[in-house]
Amino acid sequence: MTTIEPGRPDHYKWIALTNTTIGMLMATIDSSIVLISLPAIFRGIRLNPLVTTNTTYLLWLLMGYMVVTAVMVVTFGRVGDMFGRVKMYNLGFAIFTIGSLAASLTYFDGPDAALFLIAMRIVQGVGGSMLMANSTAIITDAFPEDE
């Protein structure tokens, strides 16, 4: 078995590439996937998004993830440099997954359900920003300079 660094097997780079690609795919898709399902979401929580008082819910449900990701990505990149990129990436994966699962378990309706979904989208944004901030650095660390 050949190694790039002492204690790191050669196939580590391919595992790192696969895992970071999956994480980035999830985080990127999640930034816009809600747009497709908005009619079903608002039907499910029995809320009309086009009523003036409910437009805020619509906007935050769409933009909450992207705002949090844009704000936090640089911070989590630096935190990953200080405490370990893989640790931050794995933590981001866990936070993102917990936010996704919690959002899928919304059983109530009305404005409270919309606020809960917005909060879970923000949690997903925190996890997604950890994924985005550290995935490229993990790949850079895993592959030798000549590849």
Q: What residue ranges belong to the model's regions?
A:
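Transmembrane-helix bundle of Major Facilitator Superfamily
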Residues: 2-147
